[in-house]
């Protein structure tokens, strides 16, 4: 409960005129408009204490149940190794970035870092994300072209085809395993990038003898 200040909304209470503090505001809004417990409560690591801890305590005291089933705290955003700050002159808005780069590249840059780790943003890294996207899309396009153009689509799978098919299955399983491990998007992308490398190698070595069904499965 915050004591009243001139010009602010205020209500009477046993503790004097004032208004709910930030922690109480959030707990009350979640309970009234979303219902408790909510599935996921997110926020930056700087909110873990005292804000989220107080939200949790208030919910347990008022409604005898947690405010959320899962709490996810993201790492801080850094700019070239320094905390993003207007005072340092290293502040970028999302609109400024999207005026120069595609949204998919921004998403990829974020996904390459685990959500609980600090994200070091730089335009060099964003340029790298653009190149990575082109590499992934190129591999998918090559796989689909090879699948459609293959003259060996009905042939019996050979050792190279089976090995590549296993690489596809292993990559899919590893992707899922990493995502199930605290939403480890960085590890999941590593599995995807490994499959891109395996795809390019397979297409180079198979030439015209690509197994269309395997190539199409990999592209999906």
Feature locations, PLM:
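Structural preference for alpha-helix termini/caps and helix-kink/transition segments
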Residues: 83-85, 90-220
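Alpha-helical recognition segments enriched in aromatics with Gly/Pro capping
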Residues: 1-146
């Amino acid at each position: 409960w915050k004591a009243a200040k001139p010009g602010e909304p205020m209500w009477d209470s046993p503790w004097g005129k004032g208004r709910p503090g930030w922690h109480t505001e959030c707990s009350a809004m979640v309970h009234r408009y979303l219902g408790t417990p909510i599935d996921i409560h997110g926020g930056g690591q700087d909110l873990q204490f005292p804000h989220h801890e107080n939200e949790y305590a208030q919910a347990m005291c008022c409604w005898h149940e947690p405010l959320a089933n899962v709490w996810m705290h993201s790492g801080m955003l850094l700019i070239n190794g320094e905390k993003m700050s207007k005072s340092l002159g290293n502040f970028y808005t999302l609109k400024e970035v999207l005026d120069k780069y595609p949204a998919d590249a921004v998403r990829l840059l974020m996904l390459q870092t685990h959500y609980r780790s600090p994200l070091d943003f730089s335009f060099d890294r964003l340029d790298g994300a653009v190149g990575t996207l082109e590499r992934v899309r190129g591999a998918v396009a090559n796989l689909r072209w090879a699948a459609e153009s293959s003259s060996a689509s009905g042939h019996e799978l050979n050792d190279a085809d089976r090995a590549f098919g296993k690489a596809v299955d292993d990559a899919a399983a590893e992707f899922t395993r990493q995502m199930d491990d605290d939403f480890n998007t960085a590890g999941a992308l590593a599995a995807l990038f490994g499959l891109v490398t395996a795809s390019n190698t397979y297409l180079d070595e198979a030439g015209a003898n690509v197994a269309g069904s395997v190539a199409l499965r990999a592209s999906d």
